Amino acid sequence: MRPRLSRSGARTRCVALWAVAVGTLLWVLPVTPAMASSHREAPLITQMPKVDGTDWYMFNSYEPGREAYVTMIANYQPLQAPYGGPNYFFMDPDALYEIHIDNTGDGKEDLTFQFRFKNELDNLTVPVGGKAISVPLFNIGPISGPTPPTLNIEETYTLDIVRGGRRSGNQQRVTHAGLRKPTDNIGEKSIPNYETYARSFIHDVSIPGCDGGQGRVFVGQRREPFFINLGEFFDLINLDPLGSPSAKRNILNDVNVTSLILEVPKSCLLRNASSPVIGGWTTASLRQSRILRPHPTFANPTTVGGAWTQVSRLGMPLVNELVIGVKDKDQFNASKPEDDTQFADYVTHPSLPVLIETLFPAAKAPTQFPRTDLVAVFLTGVDDVNQISESNPTPSEMLRLNTGIPATPAAHQNNLGAALCFVHGVLTLKHPGCDPAGFPNGRRPGDDIVDITLRVAMGYLLPLAIAPAGQLPFTDQATGSAAMFDTHFPYLKAPLAGSPQ
């Protein structure tokens, strides 16, 4: 199924489709320590890295034979040094990690997938002078299989589906005996063939009330998939914005991240067969209170209580990092899409083009205000393309995906997503390189969201009289593509090993 785009009103609609990207990259000057798509992007979340959502992907599965599925990837715990032992990167057992789906366009979740984690200490000991002494390390020998006797701490998780409100809806357990998370990639001596080991933790799951076949889930450490010329970008764009797209190094290539990866039949996510568009986002929540125990144990280092309180939120990439003002970043992380009109000024009057013009006077910023085209797509979706509700959608920020647009095979994906589907703002599906299955119609790992948003922010879709620099090929000079990733589930590459260095 292809998007139903008539030529009448094509300019308005294609501008809106492209403009969704502009709302995702609206500042570059550092105020707090900020990293990548949504890494350490708000003051409060820097204090709690285990619940820091870093990237969110949602796309039609392009593994051969999986055309009827959608893959969702929620990444957490940024900037993991591969050698980050001895405790490495457990998920927070006192946190609630969630993936939300809106299939009605009201800005409220209709489906929620909930992940809860549990860390179990085996308390391995060795004999020392006639006494059994607990070891200080994560493992005491090579690791293989799901329950190796040499592993000191095992991490398991549960997966539930909630239909309706996340706290008030009908909650059911996704069935699978013993969902386990693979140990982080300690090193080659501990885990000689990590990817073979990790793939044994890909689980087929049966989702209650979900037709269309079994789903798949994998939770574990992966190599950081996001790519950006980070240092220079935040240093007042200390690079050549019209230079080679691949001239600089992607510094994130040296770190890992923890991924919650879920593949679900499309039919499970849709309101009905005639409504193919969904919106999605990920959140993490903690209990309202956390009290330090004066005598902590491994199982109970703190006492937590109170209602679940959202502390991290991520839909469209770069929004809280580079759109929202510092004074509202923590509020955005705690907010729900249905309440997003409170942040509309950050989209209608974007600051990035003005700041780029300040740094590069020849690059004139667009002069059209307010940017109502951005509001249409950033908050409501584009009619006949990726708008969920066809009548009166609630303005709400989330990543929208038209599941009716066929996935592009990995070998034919364009890292500029839908960019080359437009010529001077006019939708041209037969234009060379056109890839309508890419960002901002969902997001795949190989989509170069930074270059896309830079160009659109400077007016790629606007007339030259309004956007004199709109046709310039802006870039952060760090690039990537689908070739960096696997062509099969879970798509993201194995994490970097802690050893040897």
Sequence positions of predicted segments:
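N-terminal secretory signal peptides that target proteins for export/translocation
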Residues: M1-R13
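Residue-level detector of alpha-helical transmembrane segments in integral membrane proteins
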Residues: A10, G23-L26, F218, Q310
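Bacterial N-terminal signal peptides
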Residues: V15-P30
